[in-house]
Design a protein with these regions (language model features):
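N-terminal catalytic or cofactor-binding beta/alpha core of small enzyme domains
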Residues: 2-127, 136-147, 152, 156-167, ...
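Short, internal active-site loops enriched in acidic
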Residues: 129-131
């Protein structure tokens, strides 16, 4: 990924906590917010406030990481990291249909483009949902994917920022931290129930 110009990074979780696995992004950023982050990294829960997210991105970020549940035809709980190609202002995707309560990631990027914004590099850490019906709580396969998503975001940050883990160089302590990631995430989940 290389060095960032200003080091401003936004990691945004989106989703509806009342639609089971749609809450995946919200849960991941909740776990990340409890962990130390490198300077310049903002971890934010945008829930269903896609319009607010688009306006926040107008503030300028070198790297934007969106965490969301996204059906892609994979097995439930599969975590993927996707690079986003921003639509141009004339692109039909840049003319989103606005729903004040929720915007899909594509619509957020389209709204941002139509507002004249363009974050630096944009990535999506996506998880294949099992259920997005009305209900509270993640399904078992999606809950089990939380440590993988936390690790994916932390690896993105470590690659983007020299010494991207607090108090470490890029390689020091990485193996030990990865070994405990799953245990810490599961402990955090157990105490939040």
């Amino acid at each position: 990924m290389g060095d960032l110009m200003t080091g401003r990074i936004l990691v945004a979780g989106v989703g509806n906590v009342f639609l089971r696995d749609d809450a995946f992004g919200v849960e991941v950023v909740r776990l990340l917010a409890e962990r130390p982050q490198p300077p310049g990294v903002q971890i934010r829960d945008f829930g269903i406030r896609g319009v607010h997210l688009a306006y926040e991105l107008l503030n300028g970020y070198d790297l934007f990481v969106l965490v969301d549940a996204a059906p892609r035809g994979e097995a439930p709980g599969t975590v993927s990291v996707l690079e986003v190609d921003m639509p141009g202002p004339e692109d039909p995707q840049a003319q989103p249909v606005i729903d004040a309560h929720s915007l899909t990631p594509d619509a957020v990027f389209g709204l941002l483009s139509s507002l004249g914004g363009h974050p630096g590099r944009s990535l999506v850490v996506a998880c294949e949902p099992a259920e997005v019906d009305a209900g509270m709580g993640l399904t078992d396969p999606v809950r089990a994917a939380l440590p993988d998503a936390v690790r994916a975001v932390e690896e993105i940050l470590a690659e983007a920022i020299p010494g991207g883990r607090p108090g470490e160089g890029p390689e020091e302590g990485r193996a030990a931290e990865q070994a405990t990631d799953e245990q810490e995430c599961m402990a955090d989940l157990a105490t939040s129930r």
